[in-house]
Amino acid sequence: MKTYTICGSMKFAKEMQEVAYYLETQQDCNVLQCVYTLDDYKPTKEELKKLELAHYQKIDLSDGIYVLNINGYIGESVSKEIEYAKMHGKEVIYHCK
């Protein structure tokens, strides 16, 4: 069973949760998510940096990343995550071809 970290814009948070559920229930994958349900909470710069570092550690632990590129959208942060994953020999799967 492979482990994947989901990478995508937070504007697709709901979709990332749906994809994680699908991958775990239908594709026999383990999924490391980065979506947190914190209504009306704005993280501090320090918290954002900690979350970013944790996300890269999740990529290190994973066999690959699953890029949620809805309508072809890949932002700056996700582009960096893709490059990081490739540099570390990780599989990169794109949601939209």
Task: State each model region's role.
Residues 1-97:
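Conserved catalytic or regulatory cores that recognize and/or transform ribose-phosphate-containing ligands
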